[in-house]
Swiss-Prot record:
<keyword id="KW-0949">S-adenosyl-L-methionine</keyword>
<dbReference type="InterPro" id="IPR029063">
    <property type="entry name" value="SAM-dependent_MTases_sf"/>
</dbReference>
<feature type="binding site">
    <location>
        <position position="76"/>
    </location>
    <ligand>
        <name>S-adenosyl-L-methionine</name>
    </ligand>
</feature>
<keyword id="KW-0489">Methyltransferase</keyword>
<keyword id="KW-0808">Transferase</keyword>
<dbReference type="GO" id="GO:0071424">
    <property type="term" value="F:rRNA (cytosine-N4-)-methyltransferase activity"/>
</dbReference>
<dbReference type="Pfam" id="PF01795">
    <property type="entry name" value="Methyltransf_5"/>
</dbReference>
<keyword id="KW-0963">Cytoplasm</keyword>
<feature type="binding site">
    <location>
        <begin position="30"/>
        <end position="32"/>
    </location>
    <ligand>
        <name>S-adenosyl-L-methionine</name>
    </ligand>
</feature>
<dbReference type="GO" id="GO:0070475">
    <property type="term" value="P:rRNA base methylation"/>
</dbReference>
<feature type="binding site">
    <location>
        <position position="49"/>
    </location>
    <ligand>
        <name>S-adenosyl-L-methionine</name>
    </ligand>
</feature>
<comment type="function">
    <text>Specifically methylates the N4 position of cytidine in position 1402 (C1402) of 16S rRNA.</text>
</comment>
<keyword id="KW-0698">rRNA processing</keyword>
<comment type="similarity">
    <text>Belongs to the methyltransferase superfamily. RsmH family.</text>
</comment>
<feature type="binding site">
    <location>
        <position position="97"/>
    </location>
    <ligand>
        <name>S-adenosyl-L-methionine</name>
    </ligand>
</feature>
<dbReference type="InterPro" id="IPR023397">
    <property type="entry name" value="SAM-dep_MeTrfase_MraW_recog"/>
</dbReference>
<feature type="binding site">
    <location>
        <position position="104"/>
    </location>
    <ligand>
        <name>S-adenosyl-L-methionine</name>
    </ligand>
</feature>
Length: 296
């Protein structure tokens, strides 16, 4: 069962307007969207996901609750195209949860988990060609080193890349796990689980996650108005750094007007999971919610 992270904090922070317009750019299993639908009456919700399985599983639950909803299969970086086609100019609240969902992690066939043996896949969108299998079996040594350094921050990037080249073809997640265990000393892995970082790096590359996030953040301001909010939940420092910079850039851009009008156009708040949530949902440990508010 997928438990949405920071749900209480997100819903309270959004201060949902019953007549408002909301966009969930990462539907997943619908935890955040279902909570929003319960609070909007004459409003509207548009949801996106690039994982067709997530849409198929969640669509019946959403439509059983309300009909004022649009469900779109797409990477979130293209959200502007769909909103413009729907004639939508402004949005009261955006929700983006950048985590991998529990059903994705728990299904060995998806290849996201290093604790379950399965095919090397890791595609959020199963219709795309690029998969973990292609990355690990076809990328040249230099490219593998780059993604392990850049997306995994792994000091053993060169050694892992060399071992991958020498062990091809790799077919399963456990083959990759065992390879990493042979390369990185056991005492090092006890202190820091670099296997997690290896899987993270490959997943980011397969799904073009950071580039998509950057494109999304560049497009968001166009759809904001006074009172609009953007809630983004991050799970690792790479994506959080990108979100933080984008929000701070908007805040700093407005410095002159702030001194003239006495009210910043944008402000930011940060929320972390409470102790009771961490106890019931260990996967929330690394989660962080950043909220951007347009004040005027």
């Amino acid at each position: 069962m997928h438990v949405p992270v920071l749900l209480e904090e997100l819903i309270l922070a959004l201060e949902i307007n019953p007549k408002g317009f909301y966009v969930d750019l990462t539907l997943g299993r619908g935890g955040h969207s279902l909570a929003i639908l319960e609070k909007i009456s004459n409003g509207k919700l548009v949801v996106f996901d690039k994982d067709q399985d997530a849409l198929d599983q969640t669509r019946p639950k959403l439509l059983a609750l309300k009909q004022n909803i649009e469900i779109i299969w797409s990477d979130f970086s293209r959200f502007d195209f769909y909103l413009e086609n729907l004639g939508i100019q402004f949005v009261d609240g955006f929700i983006i949860d950048l985590g991998v969902s529990s059903p994705q992690i728990d299904d060995p066939a998806r290849g996201f988990s290093y604790s379950k043996d399965g095919n090397l896949d890791m595609r959020m969108d199963k219709s795309q060609k690029l998969s973990a299998f292609i990355v690990l079996n076809e990328y040249p040594y230099e490219k593998l080193v780059e993604i392990f350094f850049k997306y995994g921050q792994i000091p053993y990037a060169r050694e892992i890349a060399r071992a991958i080249i020498n062990s091809r073809p790799l077919k399963t997640t456990f083959e990759l796990v065992n390879l990493v265990k042979k390369v990185i000393p056991a005492l090092v892995l006890v202190k820091k689980n670099f296997i997690k970082n290896v899987f993270q790096a490959v997943r980011i590359e397969v799904n073009n996650e950071l580039d998509s996030l950057q494109k999304l953040l560049e497009k968001l301001p166009k759809f904001l108005k006074q009172g609009s909010k953007v809630a983004i939940i991050t799970f690792h420092s790479l994506e959080d750094r990108i979100v933080k910079k984008a929000f701070l850039d908007l805040i700093r851009k407005d410095k002159l007007e702030f001194f003239q009008k006495g009210l910043p156009k944008f402000s930011m708040k940060v929320f972390r999971p409470k102790a009771n949530e961490l106890k019931s949902n260990p996967r929330a440990k690394s989660a962080k919610l950043r909220l951007l508010l347009q004040n005027r």
